[in-house]
Amino acid sequence: MIALFPHCGFLSETSRMLAIARALLARGEQVVVATHGGPYTRVLEEAGMPYTLLAPAMDARRCEEYLAGIVTLGKPGSRLQPADEVRAGVRSEVEFLRAHGARMVVIGFTLTAYLSARVVGIPLAASHGGSYVPPVFEQGLAPAPSQSPVPQLDWLPASMQKLMANFGPPRMRAPVAFLNEIAAELGVEPVPSLAALMLGDLTLVTDVPEVLGVSDACMSAWRPNGHRAYRAETRLRYVGPLYARLDLPIPERAEAFLDDGARPTAYVALSSSTPAFIRRVVAGVRDAGLRVLVGATIHELRDLENPDVMVEGILPSHRVMPRVTVALIMGGQGSVQTAMASGTPFVGFPLQPEQELNVALAARQGMAIAIGPRRADEAKVARAVRAIITQPAYAAAAVRVQQHYAGIDGAGRAADAVIGHLRNVNENPSTLHSARGTRFS
């Protein structure tokens, strides 16, 4: 049995876990899904995927706090989860994993599973780090941020900020203290660093060498080699792009809006943001003269509607993006890869270092512009949109990048990597030596 623990506060992660679960089922594996809740459990329900709600359950407000905590992770004094929530989460996860005889757990941002997997003594696969992996730091590929994670450091030169972006994550211990305090209580292996919080015993690297700039051979051969920043069993495997392909139709009125191609149309899909930020971005796009289709997801934005602005809820972005001139998205890898796979240039608003990398990879290819959310006033948004629609090089670059992702079944390759890792563990039990945890007391 393979368990999947999506954090359903993230639309991209929920859809990613759903895709992996389906691919595992198609390969004859037994799968169970559990989550601590969130507004996107509806995606699982609408897909007919059974799941168990684990304690403590996160309501919409707690999910908002959690997402905000992810963005500020690493800032002095920030703590993602209180100790009682971590203890309760680990306890319920351990009970679930043992009850179902799970042999492996696949996670996104359900970070308490770093401890529950060790308590149960099973390997953990992680997909939430995307391309934010050690070879990126070691080769200096993490970019200078579009805005510093700490506003007081915005004045630093880009060269210094890039050095910090590559040097810092493996050396930052404070962001994982919220887990390691409980790991010490349980007598299980801690999470050594912020960088390790994006990795698993099997790390599903959801990109391709042509985009990330790290060869397949280098990725597969990478080992911690005693580096204290990483758990000793960490392994990396390219699986290719893995983004949402929600089995939803485009609503009829949105179809009609997209078919009316008299003027360029922009797609605004900023699910991990605030209504105020979405309104600001929409205003900037309108200043640039484009019509706007808004994927509002959980936000109430109907008052924005007029003949040139349409607001819908959750939309199948992989079907919408190929039909628009430009997209405006955050920096999550799912959204970025949807644009890249669609051949659609975009403006990205990265919230944190991993998202900075995602947007930078597209910008390096010539198909995207990054704007730090703190700096994204209406005028900057309008200038970026005008640049993309008036300079054909952006659209041409997007079409070139699209070819890198063509025909790759990321979910299928992720499922194959999970199955292969389990097979290796079964054949070489010593690979789990650091994962044997204590009994939960």
Where are the language model's segments positioned?
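Short, basic, glycine/proline-bearing loop/turn elements
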Residues: 6, 75-81, 97, 175-179, ...
